[in-house]
Every structure is written in C-alpha cells, then in structure tokens.
Curated annotation (Swiss-Prot):
Self-association state and partner proteins as the record states: Part of the 30S ribosomal subunit.
Superkingdom per UniProt: Eukaryota
UniProt function note: Probably a ribosomal protein or a ribosome-associated protein.
Name under which the protein is recorded: Small ribosomal subunit protein cS23
Keyword Chloroplast part of the UniProt annotation: yes
Entry GO CC: chloroplast; ribonucleoprotein complex; ribosome
Gene Ontology biological-process entries: translation
Gene name per UniProt: ycf65
Localization in the cell: Plastid, Chloroplast
Amino acid sequence: MEIKNLSKFTLKVLWLENNIAIAIDQIVGNGTSPLTSYFFWPRNDAWEELKAELESKPWIAERDRIELLNKTTEVINYWQEEGKKHSLAKAQARFPRIYFFG
C-alpha cells in the first residue's frame, strides 16, 4: 500500500534492535514539521498511541489517518516478522517512502 498523501505527511521510523519508534511529520513547503512524538513498539502500543494522537487532530482527514495507520501496521509487522533479522538499509528498500533512522 502506498501512502497517497505523502505531500501532506511522512512517517519516520527509528529502527532499533529491540524496539522501533514511529513518528509522523507534516510536510511544509520544502521541509517537515513534527506532528507527533515518537511512539515505541513493542515497549508500548505504538499503533494505539499513534491512533489516539491522530484522532486528537480533527483537521487531519479520516482517509489520511487510515493510510498512515495502515502503513504503520505494515512497518510494525515487517519489524516483528523479518526486520529484526535485517538491516536498516533493507527496511528502507522495503519502504522507500518512509524515513528510517537507526
């Protein structure tokens, strides 16, 4: 699934050995502005925390929230199933429109 509204938002993922942390930035002009803090998985329930954060911002369209949460699910599932075995570079190749750091 491709994020269609990448011109509005981008996911950022901190790729760690025992956790991942996911945040959303808003695209503003040629740069980005943090929209959320980082939410950790599996230390905390990053998906639920991110969902609550997005729902607290009524100006974000429902379809945008759904797309961002679906992509978050894909990243979490990848990390759980395969990612712990793979490098940051492989994760970036798997999700080229998401920013990975580690």
